[in-house]
Amino acid sequence: MNKIFVITLFLFLFLTVLSFKVNKKETINYKIKNKTYKLLVTDSLVEWERGLMDIRKLNNADGMIFLFPDKKPRVFWNKNTYVDLDIYWIFNDKVVGRDFLPSINKSNGVVYVSSPVPANKVVEIINN
């Protein structure tokens, strides 16, 4: 019984710290199709891999922008993603495609979406 309590407590603390770190990240304002969004900035491999996984709500941002150092085809998925996302594929600040990525709860399985052409930025907007 004590092991279960310790594991549960550890998991709770880990998720709390993770949530705190995500909500305290750098943000930028980014305009897409005449609307300005406040976006969390991700510019490292670890952040690219996590994205908005395990996030159920963002208090200080509309979504996330992934800044990549190169232009190549991108693939995103909804593993452990609990919010619906509008995905914008961007090449040199021009939107080159858009996809919808449902939450894992709605899709009942992992869904993959791919950029139609190489992209050096990807924006995920939480779709309420």
Which role does the model predict for each range below?
Residues 1-3:
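N-terminal hydrophobic targeting signals that begin at the initiator methionine
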Residues 17-128:
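Compact, glycine-rich, soluble single-domain proteins
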Residues 5-19:
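Hydrophobic membrane-insertion alpha-helices, especially the h-region
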